[in-house]
Regions:
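Short strand-coil-strand connectors
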Residues: 9-11, 18, 25
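Basic, amphipathic DNA-recognition helix from helix-turn-helix-like DNA-binding domains
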Residues: 1-11
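Short glycine/proline-enriched coil/turn segments at helix->beta-strand junctions
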Residues: 3-5, 83-86
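Short, surface-exposed charged micro-motifs
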Residues: 12-14, 88
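Short, isolated positions in well-ordered beta-strands
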Residues: 14-15, 29
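C-terminal edge and immediately downstream basic/flexible tail or linker adjoining helix-turn-helix-like DNA-binding
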Residues: 98-103
Length: 103
């Protein structure tokens, strides 16, 4: 990462790369491992689209459970947790998702 940058940020959501922890508005946001993996992939590329298949590949690796439908479930759970924070996951039908901070 450029300039020893050890955190990624999207609005009030911050991801500390050293201890692999999210915080939202200064509060630690604890997530189940697969939700964490989804959000970790989205915050690495704020504003850039990731397809369901890309996310499934990253989240599940070679795991047989890998299903794009499961990604939808994690996205909806994450949306609930981010609700009202000014950070949101936007769906582009048939294309994928991106993370953005509301202006």
């Amino acid at each position: 990462l450029m300039g020893g940058e050890r955190q990624q940020q999207c609005g009030e959501l911050i991801y500390d790369l050293n201890d692999r922890r999210f915080s939202l508005r200064g509060e630690v946001l604890t997530l189940p491992s697969r939700e964490h993996a989804v959000l970790e992939n989205l915050i690495a590329r704020p504003g850039r689209l990731m397809s369901k298949e890309q996310l499934a590949g990253k989240v599940f690796g070679l795991d047989q459970d890998a299903s794009p439908e499961a990604i939808e479930i994690y996205i909806s759970r994450l949306r609930r947790k981010l609700d009202g924070s000014g950070v949101r996951i936007v769906t582009f039908r048939g294309l994928g998702y991106l993370l953005e901070a509301e202006a």
